[in-house]
């Protein structure tokens, strides 16, 4: 699946081998207008919007805190990117392990088994009894964990393998990644 028209397949280099796949209109939760109720929120001036100026959850990583402007802002969504093997999963596990000492944290792994995540945590000498983990690729199942556990911090590793049952496309496709990201941010 491609975000725009492609004449040549980027994987095999062949021309005119791609076929069009249409996603049914209205099947996406992101097609709703407004908020959850479908009602437009009233306009406000920036000065009237309440802010949590000083509330940030500092992580164990000084560099990550610096990049995030002082730490994690409650309610924010952060997308971490990088090349395979760059250490994204390791960094996320270190961060969530540090935060779990004082916040409820849930780590969802979609690419690795629970044994692999636990082995990495032990190798890094991270506290293994403070982070709740689940191996899952269904967004709807993740929402069930979220509703039951009510975490302060949710880590999804990785969004690329997550899928929503609301769409009939493959996990990792452009429409799936957009849908999953949009629904996670809305929540």
Region roles according to the model:
Residues 75, 83-86, 94-95, 99-186:
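Conserved inter-motif catalytic segment of the P-loop NTP-binding fold
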Residues 3-78, 100-107:
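Detector for small/aliphatic-rich hydrophobic stretches
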Residues 89:
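Walker A/P-loop
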């Amino acid at each position: 699946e491609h975000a725009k028209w492609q004449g040549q397949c980027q994987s095999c280099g062949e021309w005119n081998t791609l076929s069009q796949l249409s996603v049914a209109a209205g099947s996406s939760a992101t097609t709703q207008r407004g908020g959850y109720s479908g009602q437009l929120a009233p306009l406000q001036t920036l000065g009237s919007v309440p802010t949590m100026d000083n509330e940030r959850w500092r992580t164990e990583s000084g560099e990550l805190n610096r990049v995030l402007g002082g730490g994690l802002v409650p309610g924010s969504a952060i997308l971490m990117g990088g090349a395979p093997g760059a250490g994204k999963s390791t960094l996320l596990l270190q961060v969530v392990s540090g935060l779990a000492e004082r916040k409820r944290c849930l780590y969802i792994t979609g690419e690795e088994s629970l044994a692999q995540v636990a082995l990495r945590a032990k190798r890094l000498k991270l506290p293994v009894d403070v982070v709740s983990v689940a191996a899952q690729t269904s967004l709807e199942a993740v929402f069930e964990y979220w509703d039951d556990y009510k975490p302060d911090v949710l880590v999804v590793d990785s969004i690329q393998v997550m899928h929503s049952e609301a769409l009939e496309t493959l996990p990792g496709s452009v429409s799936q990644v957009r849908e999953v990201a949009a629904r996670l941010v809305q929540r």
